[in-house]
Amino acid sequence: MTAALVDSLRRPGRLITVELRPPRSGLSAAEGMDSWIDLNHSIRHLAIKDIFVFLTDDAVGSREEENLGHLAANVGSDVPLSRLVPFLTCKHTIEHCLLYADRAHSLGFEALTVVGGDVSTGPPRCVPHSYMLRQRIRERQPGLSLGGWANPHRDSSKQVEYIGSDDFSAEFYLTQIVSHHS
């Protein structure tokens, strides 16, 4: 069985997705709660309109709140988890990453985007390249559709080579057209 996201990507026509970031960690309890409430409203509004929502995980090196726990606990039963696609970076221990994927699958998420994470900041990656983590996750959770990322700041022909490789281990990939890092 493929994820709703993968099925939608294969269909002709337009597909709109949105990437959101959880609140940064270190906020006061009140600020954190307000941020999560605002984010939750956005997620619910988009997902109910059949828009896929990707929620990042420390992708740019800023400490963020853990996304999976929030999504599972707070979005509500009227929001299909098939429309929500959490990110997982390699910037955690391998044990955390594998358990995260197990949790995602057991909670009912159909897809997970696994990316390396910014090597210039924050904790080190548990594996050198995200495809290695996707391979490990695939062994444990073969029913979870996995995605990757093509880096728009690297050589484009090399990025295409990576995503076209059999060991990329992903059913979908993302990239950025415009970046706030540029």
Predicted feature descriptions by range:
Residues 31-37, 89-103:
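Glycine-rich anion/phosphate-binding loops
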Residues 117-174:
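Internal, glycine-rich beta/alpha segment that forms the wall or movable "lid"
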Residues 16-22, 51-55, 83-88, 112-114, ...:
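Hydrophobic faces of well-ordered beta-strands that scaffold small-molecule active sites
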Residues 6-11, 40-48, 69-81, 101-109, ...:
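Acidic (Asp/Glu)-rich catalytic clusters
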Residues 94-105, 158-168, 182:
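Catalytic cores of alpha/beta
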Residues 1-21, 25, 30:
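N-terminal amphipathic alpha-helix/helix-capping segment at the start of soluble metabolic enzymes
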Residues 22-31, 47-69, 116-126, 182:
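Glycine-rich, proline-tolerant flexible connector loops at the mouths of alpha/beta enzymes
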Residues 61-86, 127-149:
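Alpha-helix-loop-beta-strand connector modules within alpha/beta enzyme cores
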